[in-house]
Amino acid sequence: MTEITKLDPDVAIDLAYDIFLEMAPEHLDPADILLFNLQFEERGGVEFVETADDWEMEIGVLIDPEEYAEVWIGLVNEQDEMDDIFAKFLISHREEDREFHVVWKK
């Protein structure tokens, strides 16, 4: 089995944020987009997190957490915790065949 070259966290964050900006208008409520735009400079966060192993419930496909990076985009509270998540991204580490899945705020 070949070794997977993992995405650099900064690259994963940039990819997720670019996809978020492109797709958010189609997937988020207009009020959430307005809230995000008004609050992002002060409270916004884009975090590279440990890849969860429960993505199968979200996307209907079993994944190997070692093969994907997970990034959350949202707003943080006074305790510096992300309490309003607008999107969770799952991005494959495979550069030649990049896949991504997004769970949008409902």
Swiss-Prot record:
SUPFAM superfamilies: Putative dsDNA mimic
Pfam family, one: DUF440
Matches recorded under InterPro entries: dsDNA_mimic_put, Put_dsDNA_mimic_sf
Annotated function: May act as a double-stranded DNA (dsDNA) mimic. Probably regulates the activity of a dsDNA-binding protein.
Family: Belongs to the putative dsDNA mimic protein family.
Name the record gives this protein: Putative double-stranded DNA mimic protein PM0536
Organism the protein comes from: Pasteurella multocida (strain Pm70)
